[in-house]
């Protein structure tokens, strides 16, 4: 049995950057709930979304699909999508295998995410 289902918290790191910090497991049982939460908390006026997966312990194909969907939606709204996940973690390895870096900026920390927003 895996750890626990995902919990998400939102903060405004700066006026132009909303951070969604996800802890626990992202899978088919909660991806729709996570999708709704992000849709409700990230307005089209925000410049960027930083999805912090530092405390995410597991992600399945439904969670990966969610990240690609978010990337498409944010790109259509000309918003920057950054995913924070430390190197060497299982979640990072999965995301690299799925080439999430082709649709989002993949970084190791929230500070790196903010730098990516500044550079865009």
Predicted regions and their residues:
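Short acidic-hydrophobic, aromatic-tinged amphipathic segments that line or gate anion-handling sites
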Residues: 103-109, 113
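STAS-typified acidic loop motif
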Residues: 2-36, 53-55
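Short, solvent-exposed coil/turn elements at secondary-structure transition points
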Residues: 25, 87, 110-112
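Amphipathic alpha-helical interaction surfaces in cytosolic regulatory modules
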Residues: 28-104
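A short, flexible N-terminal coil/short beta segment enriched in small residues
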Residues: 1-2, 70
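A short, charged, amphipathic alpha-helix used as a generic interaction element across diverse proteins
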Residues: 113-120
